[in-house]
UniProtKB/Swiss-Prot annotation:
<keyword id="KW-0872">Ion channel impairing toxin</keyword>
<feature type="disulfide bond">
    <location>
        <begin position="51"/>
        <end position="72"/>
    </location>
</feature>
<dbReference type="GO" id="GO:0005576">
    <property type="term" value="C:extracellular region"/>
</dbReference>
<feature type="disulfide bond">
    <location>
        <begin position="55"/>
        <end position="74"/>
    </location>
</feature>
<protein>
    <recommendedName>
        <fullName>Putative sodium channel toxin Ts38</fullName>
    </recommendedName>
</protein>
<keyword id="KW-0732">Signal</keyword>
<feature type="disulfide bond">
    <location>
        <begin position="42"/>
        <end position="65"/>
    </location>
</feature>
<keyword id="KW-1015">Disulfide bond</keyword>
<dbReference type="InterPro" id="IPR002061">
    <property type="entry name" value="Scorpion_toxinL/defensin"/>
</dbReference>
<feature type="signal peptide">
    <location>
        <begin position="1"/>
        <end position="22"/>
    </location>
</feature>
<keyword id="KW-0964">Secreted</keyword>
<keyword id="KW-0738">Voltage-gated sodium channel impairing toxin</keyword>
<comment type="similarity">
    <text>Belongs to the long (3 C-C) scorpion toxin superfamily. Sodium channel inhibitor family.</text>
</comment>
<dbReference type="InterPro" id="IPR036574">
    <property type="entry name" value="Scorpion_toxin-like_sf"/>
</dbReference>
<dbReference type="Pfam" id="PF00537">
    <property type="entry name" value="Toxin_3"/>
</dbReference>
<comment type="function">
    <text>Putative sodium channel toxin.</text>
</comment>
<keyword id="KW-0528">Neurotoxin</keyword>
Length: 87
């Protein structure tokens, strides 16, 4: 009985690890900021993911995410610096 419990826990843990890794691989896509330009969300063709960070400059209104939702490049509005920042 102990072996069954152990393997059940191991199986559930492996499913959790697989889901986390799968999510990180599909999070590339565009992001949009809120009205204040602070919180960003990555848009994938199937779902929307939050970048969980504040943009370095509040002027960022659009951009794109690379790798997963914690790495975002910010574009700036017309008249602002054209450089991209990562946070």
């Amino acid at each position: 009985m102990k072996h069954l419990k152990f393997y059940s826990i191991l199986f559930l843990f492996s499913i959790f690890v697989y889901k986390v890794n799968a999510l990180q691989k599909i999070l590339d896509g565009y992001f949009l900021s809120d009205e204040e330009g602070l919180f960003l969300s990555c848009k994938h063709k199937f779902d929307e993911y939050f970048c969980l960070e504040k943009c370095v400059e509040s002027g960022a209104k659009d951009g794109y995410c690379v790798g997963h939702s914690f790495i975002c490049f910010c574009k700036y509005e017309v008249g602002s610096s054209p450089r991209h920042f990562m946070f």
